[in-house]
Amino acid sequence: MTFKRVHLIVMDSVGIGEAPDAEKFGDAGSHTLKHTLEGFEGKLPNLEKLGLGNIAPLPVVNKVDKPEAYYTKLSEASVGKDTMTGHWEIMGLNIDQPFKVYPDGFPEELVTAIEEMTGRKVVANKPASGTAIIDEWGAHQMETGDLIVYTSADPVLQIAAHEEIIPLEELYEICEKVREYTKDPKYLIGRIIARPYVGEPGNFTRTSNRHDYALKPFGRTVMNELQDAGRDVIAIGKINDIYDGEGVTKSIRTKDNMDGMDKLLEVVKSDFDGLSFLNLVDFDALYGHRRDKEGYMNAIKAFDDRLGELLEALREDDLLIITADHGNDPTMPGTDHTREYVPLLMYSKQFDSGRELESHTTFASIGATIADNFGVELPEFGKSYLEELK
């Protein structure tokens, strides 16, 4: 069975249990979905009927006799647990050199280089929450024009500045310069992120003018193959940034998860031939890193509420794929991602019923299935499930 269109949703960080090598990453016992849903008193009827509860025992999501989707869990072959590594593997790359994280801030030589190339002083230079760092340094930045440089548990370098002090175009230009400089392999920083904010001391707000400057993928992805074959590749949310535009034919920005679902529904109702690819980042950015279990739980419920609308809007020859890129268990110590299996659900109105697919294959099985469906070159690793979808 083949499909005219494939819609791929990455529920960012919604892992489904510790990976076989979780202990090496300090993540033994992690289980984002299970731990997030413990104590939840609502229901998730759409994820349940697709078969999410058939993948692993979960609170409130029951196992069903006739799941509507094909389902399994996938493990990551690459040596990281960050967003870029997970997404790049989904599209067929095996990342064997991990991106670097900077738990003690960036090296002095890099800070000096940023100051010299921008003519502005760097302050902060430490891991921090984006909202906390502007609360701490925002007023200082307004007075001095310094750059608030910070990182997180991810391999990112973020630069925050007030929009009225450093205009957006200048902030973007600064980030482009830093991106170019940090392409040196000794840094291995996945993304440089512009983080503009507005407001007054005590009431700062980050704006939607964030921009990510990623490294280009380390090889060709399934998205490149689709683009070369004349197919549409519609990137929704931060997908375009994650792949640095490689293989993307159209990019649609989003404000949050619900706006992402709105934009996906618009795409589903439009005419195109190929892949739509949505990342829902709020699970990770707003709730996982902040260890906000209740917020995470409510975000999953909000997604399930919208999922019913999406299922109804799908065309007969559409395939919907729902997965994740890593875990971020809000009950674990620290603020970092967790090394976990990710769920895989594949649904089409053409299916009489779903069933379990072979488990323990890699994230690249998703890209392989998409490539197989559209008749383009398959990635070097990853198992296509296309023949099993009937």
From Swiss-Prot:
Its EC number is 5.4.2.7. Its cofactor is Mn(2+). Its main location: cytoplasm. It catalyses: 2-deoxy-alpha-D-ribose 1-phosphate = 2-deoxy-D-ribose 5-phosphate; alpha-D-ribose 1-phosphate = D-ribose 5-phosphate. Mn(2+) 2 binds at D284, H289, H337. It comes from the Bacteria. It is found in: Cytoplasm. One of its GO terms (biological process) is metabolic compound salvage. InterPro entries: Alkaline_phosphatase_core_sf (IPR017850), DeoB (IPR010045), Metalloenzyme (IPR006124), Phosphopentomutase_DeoB_cap_sf (IPR024052). GO terms for cellular component: cytosol. Pathway: Carbohydrate degradation; 2-deoxy-D-ribose 1-phosphate degradation; D-glyceraldehyde 3-phosphate and acetaldehyde from 2-deoxy-alpha-D-ribose 1-phosphate: step 1/2. Binds 2 manganese ions. It is an enzyme of class 5 (isomerase). One of its GO terms (molecular function) is manganese ion binding. Keywords: Cytoplasm, Isomerase, Manganese, Metal-binding. Coiled coil: none annotated. Mn(2+) 1 binds at D12, D325, H326. Gene3D superfamilies: Alkaline Phosphatase, subunit A (3.40.720.10), Phosphopentomutase (3.30.70.1250). Isomerase that catalyzes the conversion of deoxy-ribose 1-phosphate (dRib-1-P) and ribose 1-phosphate (Rib-1-P) to deoxy-ribose 5-phosphate (dRib-5-P) and ribose 5-phosphate (Rib-5-P), respectively. Belongs to the phosphopentomutase family. NCBIfam families: deoB (TIGR01696), PRK05362.1 (NF003766). This is Phosphopentomutase. It comes from Macrococcus caseolyticus (strain JCSC5402) (Macrococcoides caseolyticum).
